[in-house]
UniProtKB/Swiss-Prot annotation:
Keyword Membrane: no
Matches recorded under Gene3D superfamilies: 3.30.70.260, 3.40.50.1360
Protein name: Ribose-5-phosphate isomerase A
Keywords assigned by UniProt, alphabetized: Isomerase
Source organism: Korarchaeum cryptofilum (strain OPF8)
Catalytic reaction(s) noted: aldehydo-D-ribose 5-phosphate = D-ribulose 5-phosphate
Annotated binding of substrate, by residue: S27, G28, S29, T30, D80, G81, A82, D83, K93, G94, G95, G96, K120
NCBIfam families in the record: PRK00702.1, rpiA
GO molecular function: ribose-5-phosphate isomerase activity
Length: 225
């Protein structure tokens, strides 16, 4: 059912593209499905895409889409996924480790659209998942210790294949196991205030539209409504 919902919401997002010429692409499994649907549509030969990760760049190239890199013109729309979405449309992101580039795309897009299945809806961010933080490799053990001390939470360097997970930017991901967030904006600011932190996977006020699939229906949520 979840796979069905992902494809359903991806197809719904495709309807929003219109005559857009430059499209930003987030990362993750739902965005990968969106790329597949985009490649099958009549828009495929008329659009250029800016990927947020090597993962989604590979998917886009394999699907025959024209890939470009950020330089000058900004995306009219970026389509992205999320790990959690709260009632104010704040987002938790970074499960795939692409949070920094995703946030750059989100900030520089005219419209930022989130697509997700219904399991991503939560009352408060960090209800189900740890908070991803991208940090510099330089002094990473110090940064980890400072995060643990500052927030009195368990925090660990993300491991992949027995080694620290390295982002596309050459950084490390630290996952903070914190309680559900009462004030995401404050938490974002506090985490970014720790030297060594590059970016944090809290996206406050960036999502313009959130498309949520539940069963055979897609609900559209808008910022401010």
């Amino acid at each position: 059912m979840i796979e069905f919902e992902k494809r359903l919401v991806a197809r719904e997002a495709l309807k929003l593209i219109g005559d857009v010429k430059l499209l930003g692409l987030g990362s993750g499994s739902t965005v990968a499905i969106f790329v597949e649907e985009l490649a099958k549509s009549d828009k495929a030969g008329k659009i250029k895409v800016i990927p947020s990760s090597k993962q989604i760049e590979e998917v886009a190239r394999n699907q025959g889409l024209e890939v470009i890199y950020p330089d000058g013109e900004r995306p009219e729309i970026t389509v992205d996924g999320a790990d959690e979405i709260d009632s104010n449309l704040n987002l938790l992101k970074g499960g795939g480790g692409a949070l920094l580039r995703e946030k750059v795309l989100a900030y520089n897009s005219s419209t930022y659209v989130i697509i997700a299945d219904h399991t991503k809806l939560v009352e408060k961010l960090c209800s189900k998942r740890a908070l991803p933080v991208e940090v510099l490799p330089y002094g990473v053990s110090w940064t980890l210790g400072n995060l643990i001390k500052r927030f009195n939470c368990d925090a660990r360097i993300r491991i992949k294949d027995l080694s620290p997970f390295i982002t596309d930017n050459g950084n490390v991901i630290v996952d903070i196991n914190c309680p559900p967030l009462e004030d995401p904006a404050s938490m974002e600011s506090e985490v970014k205030g720790v030297p060594g932190v590059v970016e944090v996977g809290i996206f406050v006020g960036l999502a313009d539209l959130v498309l949520i699939a539940r069963g055979s229906e897609v609900k559209v949520l808008r910022q401010g409504f």
